[in-house]
């Protein structure tokens, strides 16, 4: 499954055609960060991709998404250390149903610093991601199509701050900056 699914309505809607247009340029003018990307780098950079890492303050996590959710709840749930894939969404729903409040702080500088640290730990801990980053030059995009709603979702502008982190780690992988420069 590459993400190039045929829509069930059998109709080429404008939203679906926009999605197909983006897919046609994947790995030509951008790397799509998505579990269905045609590039292994795009798959590995997706937040739910299993690539265990250790954060010195928070410990071990299987995925970036698990860490992200762990730090976003007022009462951190240990399950986020190991839960993967779509089970992460189910764990989030359970936490909310149990009254555990989720803090919305994606624009918070401390949150973004923590995510930057975590992305660095994830990539430095996975030689395959690091190597592929060193060999890549294309910019990153994040988009998908919701078939049931006939909705093309492009989160690239919203996630630019995260792509900037990937770009900085890519500079490290390509020898353009030092680890010390990356951390500051």
Where do the language-model regions lie?
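Charged, low-complexity intrinsically disordered segments
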Residues: 2-184
């Amino acid at each position: 499954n590459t993400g190039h699914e045929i829509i069930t309505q059998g109709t080429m809607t404008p939203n679906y055609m926009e999605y197909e247009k983006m897919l046609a340029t994947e790995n030509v003018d951008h790397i799509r960060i998505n579990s269905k990307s045609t590039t292994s780098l795009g798959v590995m950079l997706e937040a739910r991709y299993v690539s265990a890492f250790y954060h010195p303050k928070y410990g071990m996590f299987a995925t970036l998404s698990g860490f992200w959710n762990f730090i976003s709840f007022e009462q951190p749930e240990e399950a986020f250390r190991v839960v993967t894939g779509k089970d992460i969404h189910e764990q989030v729903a359970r936490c909310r149903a149990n009254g555990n409040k989720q803090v919305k702080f994606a624009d918070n500088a401390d949150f973004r610093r923590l995510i930057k640290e975590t992305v660095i730990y994830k990539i430095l801990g996975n030689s395959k991601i690091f190597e592929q980053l060193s060999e890549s030059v294309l910019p990153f995009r994040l988009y998908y199509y919701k078939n049931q709603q006939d909705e093309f979702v492009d989160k690239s502008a919203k996630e630019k701050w995260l792509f900037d982190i990937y770009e900085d780690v890519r500079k490290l992988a390509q020898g353009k900056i030092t680890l010390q420069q990356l951390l500051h």
